[in-house]
Amino acid sequence: MATAFHGMFTGGRYTVPQKMEDFLLDAFTKYCEDNSTEDLLIKDVKPFFKQYLRISDKLLHFLQPHDFILKGTTEVVDFERYLYQGGLFLILNQNLDLIQDNWKLVLNSLGRKPSYKERLTFPDVQKLAASLNQDTPQSTVADMLTLQGDKQYINFFDFALILGRVGELNMKWD
């Protein structure tokens, strides 16, 4: 997963705000107590994020459990990865209304039905830039489409990350 929000990183390393870390630790502890376990397994990541972190189904759709695998295992969640991904999803979840409103505006301007399952392609982004009457360099448009590997589209989750990168999301955790 790409580095989403530079404000949450110091010296190239991710720093989880203390209140958020406390919330994530409490959720993990409660899960372990409720399930008589010391580990969170990959197969339980999505249900855990839904029940214990209260992450919206719209965001859970984009959660990739394999991003959590502890090196040397095939089914145990790496706790540091949990803190990073959990923090990211909590921030996106608390900003979900703003993300949805902006996504809807973008899709409406393209004449498309608003849906979190829609994708924007390179021509879509070019059309948006033209409709905004912007002289957006092609490299900027291409950068928006290369968030992960060779993927040539922007989905709802990528769009949320872009909003975070440009400072449009509330990064405070209460």
Residue ranges, per PLM feature:
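Eukaryote-specific, cytoplasm-facing alpha-helical/coiled-coil scaffolding segments in long proteins
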Residues: L53, N108-R112, K151, N155
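Strongly charged, low-complexity linkers/loops
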Residues: L105-Q148
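EF-hand Ca2+-binding helix-loop-helix modules
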Residues: M1-T37, I42-K46, L59-Q64, V77-R112
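Acidic, divalent-cation-chelating loop motifs in proteins
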Residues: C32-N35, I69-L70, L107-N108, L145-G149
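Amphipathic regulatory helices of Ca2+-sensor modules
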Residues: D39-S56, V77-L90, R119-D135, N155-N170
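Intrinsically disordered, low-complexity regions enriched in proline, serine, glycine
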Residues: D57-H61, Q94-N95, P137-Q138, M171-K172
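A positional/structural detector of protein chain ends, strongest at the extreme C-terminus
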Residues: T3, M171-D174
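N-terminal leader/targeting helix
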Residues: F48-T74
